Amino acid sequence: MPESILGRMSGATVLRKWVAKPFLLVNEWAWKRLPPSIVATRPLRLYGSFLYTLVDLRSERRQYHGTFFLRNRPELELIRALVTPRGNGSTLRLLVLACSNGAEVYSILWTIRSARPDLNVVTHAVDISDEILEVAKEGLYSLTLNKLIDSSLFERLNEEEMRAMFDRDKDQVKIKPWIKQGINWQVADAQDPGLARLFGLQDIVVANRFLCHMPRPEAERCLRNIAKLVNPGGYLFVSGVDLDLRAKVAIDLGWKPVPDLLEEIHDGDPSVRRDWPWKYWGLEPFNSKRQDCSIRYASVFQVFNKA
């Protein structure tokens, strides 16, 4: 079925309002019983895109704090590769937006400081919620229950990594001081046009997994605003965002996609891949045959001063 026809069908008001819910329930039941080899075919990808459009049209965006330590290992591997050539004892300016409970910023700092303990890493960790930021600042986590997060923060760590990152006391763990040191915690809104004045230019800006929870026009304005934080020639990590929107902004602002580990990073977080096409934050399968593959699926960009 041609993609354009599917797109027009998914936008039909009658289909959205009266048919979509039962239609999606039946399709989800059938989809989850298909062999992976069938789901990977082009006709099923196109049909999945049609289903995702329906899901997206019916979904209400909401703030979400669920995350994991070492959530996307290939992404962390690329961060390690980018900081490795830096001069001995040099300063690295890092800003992590929507840092949530701290899992991402601590994962990044553990990666950087394990590889380059000599670097002076000046870190800003930012979130819009003062409540979740307090959890992050404390760096103390329950192994049995987290009040704000439904899933286990530690499910992607092995025992060696748990020992390397945390000090344990019974049913709690605390992030090790050498990882935590020197972080500047700040309640702020990524949409604030004064953000660049507040934090200055950064060598690496991480803006992962929160733009998808905004309406698209709001997300686009926010992404353009975030780009102003990146030092010319620096790097922007941005995943968890509508792929068409990200590609549009990247082209408009002249970002250079980083090709290293492109597919590995795209597929590096199994939770969002598993959720496509049934959740609005789900991530479509990597398609190397697309002509725009290198920019559509890139989630790491070198940014220059066109923002």
Q: Where do the protein language model's features map onto the residues?
A:
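A short glycine-rich, Lys/Arg-flanked "PGG" loop and its adjoining helix->strand segment in the class I
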Residues: E220-P232
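Conserved SAM-binding loop of SAM-dependent methyltransferases across substrates and taxa
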Residues: N101-D118
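Conserved AdoMet
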Residues: G7-R8, A12-L95
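A short His-aromatic
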Residues: C212-M214, D244
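Conserved S-adenosyl-L-methionine
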Residues: A98-S100, D127
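Conserved Class I S-adenosyl-L-methionine
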Residues: Y141-Q172, K248-A298
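Conserved beta-strand signature within the Rossmann-like core of class I S-adenosyl-L-methionine
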Residues: P232-V241
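Extended basic-aromatic, gly/pro-enriched interface segments that bind polyanionic ligands
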Residues: V122-G200, V206, F210
